[in-house]
Amino acid sequence: MAEYPQLLHTVLDTTRPRELAEFYRQLLGLRYRTGDEPPAPGVPDDADWLVLEDSLGVRKLAFQLVDQLPRTTWPKHEVPMQLHLDFTVSSPAELHRQRERAEALGAELVLDRSADPDEPLFVLADPSGHPFCLFVQ
């Protein structure tokens, strides 16, 4: 049987790695990789690369510092969306609950298709502007 490369994690560019990592940590219930935890109060945070793992220690997302990050204008095409993340929830009620959680954590609503009978979903943008979808599966 042939071996294939395995996906380690998805890396998101950001001008604020800690802020974006914290957003996804809280949204998805992840934890920091050992050594990537926030510094003690009063200690500068100079992190330029952070990794989040699940409860089993499997890497899920990484955050890489960049100097600039033009925010996507999707659905307009001036600054295209080059990647987006899809997250599923179990019911329409959970879809609305998770949208509210995401917005409370700093996400912005981009598109509301929650009334779509075939595939209810929300498209939101994280604090760095990366689009992500919440939909019922």
Label each region the model flagged.
Residues 1-4, 77-79:
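Short, flexible turn/loop "capping" segments at secondary-structure junctions
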Residues 8, 48, 119-121:
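Short loop/turn microsegments at loop-to-beta-strand junctions
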Residues 9, 60-62, 84:
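Structural preference for beta-strand elements that scaffold enzyme active sites
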Residues 17-18, 56, 70, 78-128:
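Vicinal oxygen chelate
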Residues 61-71:
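Short, solvent-exposed beta-alpha or beta-beta edge segments that form flexible loop/patches at the rim
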